[in-house]
């Protein structure tokens, strides 16, 4: 679906903009960029969206998302190495969950901005 671009005046009329202090943002910019890089991969984004619903084991994630096992393992390793997910072992299963509430806030915002209304 092609995207429609609107002039900046359209956005000014539609959205009240919060005051963003660039100097304050600078102190957290590297961390913010790191999170955005992690979310910039579609498989990782979908994994985190699924995990935003609660804890899941690898088998559940593979079934629910349809991601191949090698890709799933690779992307979960990235999320673990970047401390974006927590892990918990129960028997032979490893369960994953989102580690940081800020990541959940970003996912909620992305869902609100990019997901059609009325669909989960």
Task: Mark where each language-model region is.
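Amphipathic alpha-helical dimerization/coiled-coil segments
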Residues: 1-31, 103-120
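Short glycine/proline-rich, acidic loop/turn segments that cap or connect secondary-structure elements
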Residues: 2, 77-78
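N-terminal helix-turn-helix DNA-binding core of bacterial DNA-binding proteins
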Residues: 23-70, 90, 94-102
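Generic helix-packing signal
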Residues: 33-36, 77, 107
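Residues at the C-terminal ends
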Residues: 53, 81-82
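Alpha-helical residues within the helix-turn-helix
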Residues: 63, 74, 80-81
């Amino acid at each position: 679906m092609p995207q429609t671009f609107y002039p900046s005046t359209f956005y000014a009329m539609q959205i009240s903009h919060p005051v963003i202090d660039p100097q304050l943002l600078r102190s957290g910019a590297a961390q913010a960029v790191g999170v955005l890089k992690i979310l910039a991969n579609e498989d990782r984004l979908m994994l985190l969206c699924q995990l935003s619903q609660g804890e899941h084991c690898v088998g559940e994630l593979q079934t629910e998302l349809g991601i191949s096992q090698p890709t799933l393992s690779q992307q979960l390793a990235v999320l673990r190495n970047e401390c974006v997910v927590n892990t918990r072992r129960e028997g032979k299963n490893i369960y994953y969950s989102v580690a940081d509430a800020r990541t959940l806030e970003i996912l909620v915002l992305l869902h609100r901005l990019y997901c059609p209304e009325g669909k989960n």
